[in-house]
C-alpha cells in the first residue's frame, strides 16, 4: 500500500479532534476563546475570568467569579517542604526545570495525584496548580538569588500577586494590567506541541500532573515557549537602531531565523502580537523598542510575502523587560498562562477519550538475515 499521501510531517494541518475551546483564523489573523475575540477579552476581561471561561465554557456571574477567585487565592501557598526543595535545587537549574520538579513533587504529595484523569479531577487539581505556578516561579528566582521567600497575598489578583512576590512590593496598576493581559494572551492557542503533549498523556488515562509535566517539557523548547527569550536577546544583540538593516540582511544571507517571526498557523500578523506591541510601546525600553520596530518593518517588507510575519514572541519580551522581569523567567510566564488552556483541553479530550496513537511510515529494509556476531565486520 502506498501511504505517501497520508504522511504529514510535523502533523501540519492535521485535525485530530473537534473542540469548542479555541478557534484560530490563520489567514485573517483572528483568535477566539469560546467564541470571544482575544482583543475584547484582553481589553475588558481578567485572567481569572478567562480561565473560568475556558474551563466551563461561559463567562461567570459575579458570584461565580468571586468564588472562583477565592478558590485560586486560598490555593496559592506552598508547603514548607516545597520551599526546602527549591532551596536544595542547583542554582543553575533552568526556571522551567525548577517548575517541572516542583509540580512533580506536588503530584507526589497529593493523595489523589495518581487518580486517572476525569474532567472533574482535571478542574479540581487544575485550580491548585494554576494558583501555585506564580508562587513557584517568583520564589524560585528569589531563592536562587539569595532573597527571602515572599508568601502570596490573597487580596491581590493573579497577575499582581506574581509581580508582588517577584519584586517584594505591590506593582503599579499599569504593570498589573500588562501582566494580566499577557496571561490572557498566553492562556490558550488551540493545539500545539505542548497542548498535544498534554492531551497525549491524558489520553492514556494517566494523572493530571503527568499530563501537565509533558506540556511543561514541550513548552521549554526554544522553538516553542522558549522563543520569547530568544527574541529579546536578538534585539540586544543588534545593539542599536542604526545596525538593524545590516543585521537583518546578514541574517537572511546566513539563513538565520528571525526570532519572533513566522508561525505554523498564522500567515499574517499574529493578533496577540498587536496587543503586546501596544504595551511594549508604553512599558518597554525605548532603544530596544525602536530596534524591534525597525526590524519589524523589514520583516513585513521582505518576508510577509512568504507568509512570515510577526508572532506572539516578538513583542512580549519587551513588555516583561519593562516590568523588570528577568529574561530567564519569560518562558515560565508562558506556562503560567497556558496552564489554563492545557487544563481545558485535557478535560475536553478525556470526556470522550480515545488514546492518541498515530503511525510512522516505515522507509527501511525488510527481510534482512541475522548474522552471528563473530561473522560481522
Curated annotation (Swiss-Prot):
It comes from the Archaea. It is an enzyme of class 2 (transferase). InterPro entries: 2-MeCitrate/Citrate_synth_II (IPR011278), Citrate_synth-like_lrg_a-sub (IPR016142), Citrate_synth-like_sm_a-sub (IPR016143), Citrate_synthase (IPR002020), Citrate_synthase_AS (IPR019810), Citrate_synthase_bac-typ (IPR024176), Citrate_synthase_sf (IPR036969). Belongs to the citrate synthase family. PROSITE patterns: CITRATE_SYNTHASE. This is Citrate synthase. Its EC number is 2.3.3.16. It comes from Pyrococcus furiosus (strain ATCC 43587 / DSM 3638 / JCM 8422 / Vc1). One of its GO terms (biological process) is carbohydrate metabolic process. GO terms for molecular function: citrate (Si)-synthase activity. Pathway: Carbohydrate metabolism; tricarboxylic acid cycle; isocitrate from oxaloacetate: step 1/2. It holds the Pfam family Citrate_synt. The keyword Transferase applies. The active site is at residues 263, 313. It catalyses: oxaloacetate + acetyl-CoA + H2O = citrate + CoA + H(+). The keyword Metal-binding does not apply. Keywords: Allosteric enzyme, Transferase, Tricarboxylic acid cycle. One of its GO terms (cellular component) is cytoplasm. Homodimer. The lineage of its organism: Archaea, Methanobacteriati, Methanobacteriota, Thermococci, Thermococcales.
